[in-house]
């Protein structure tokens, strides 16, 4: 775990400029910018412990400020995600995977407008979900409306479905 860094670009450069669009435009640039900023904090001993083969870092995890688009942020924010880095490096070592998620979870209100849970620090659910992708686990939530037939999905019982949002 390293000290927070502040990137020079606005969030829209990474999440997107189209507020009603759920597609991130450039999360890889956030990874590259964050790696450059944290590089001075990373020691040679750290690099050795990160590199199981001596050449590559398997995965880095980035927690970005604010809400993620997946958790109440608007369309210009970054959606929590996991992907390959496309050859990004940290202190001369290639980083294979990145995972990222937002720092905050949203306020939740009931049907009467009463706050059930105030906005606060995000729980481990989304972190565990996204990191599990870097280990090879797939999403278990339905990706087609027809898959919601008779409420048969795993929902909150599975970390790779809605369980990531149980706080």
Per-range role (PLM):
Residues 1-153, 157, 161-166:
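Active-site-proximal segment of zinc-dependent metalloprotease catalytic domains
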């Amino acid at each position: 775990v390293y000290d927070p860094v502040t990137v020079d670009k606005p969030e829209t450069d990474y999440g997107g400029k189209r507020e009603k669009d759920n597609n991130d435009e450039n999360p890889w640039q956030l990874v590259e910018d964050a790696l450059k900023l944290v590089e001075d904090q990373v020691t040679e001993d750290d690099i050795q412990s990160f590199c199981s083969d001596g050449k590559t870092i398997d995965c880095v995890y980035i927690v970005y400020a604010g809400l993620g688009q997946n958790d109440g942020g608007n369309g210009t924010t970054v959606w929590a995600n996991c992907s390959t880095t496309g050859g990004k490096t940290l202190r001369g070592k290639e980083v294979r995977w990145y995972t990222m998620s937002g720092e905050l979870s949203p306020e939740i209100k009931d049907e009467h407008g009463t706050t059930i849970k105030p906005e606060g620090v995000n729980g481990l659910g989304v972190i565990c979900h996204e990191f599990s992708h870097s280990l090879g686990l797939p999403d278990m939530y339905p990706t087609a409306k027809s898959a919601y037939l008779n409420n048969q999905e795993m929902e909150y019982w599975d970390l790779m479905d809605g369980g990531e949002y149980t706080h």
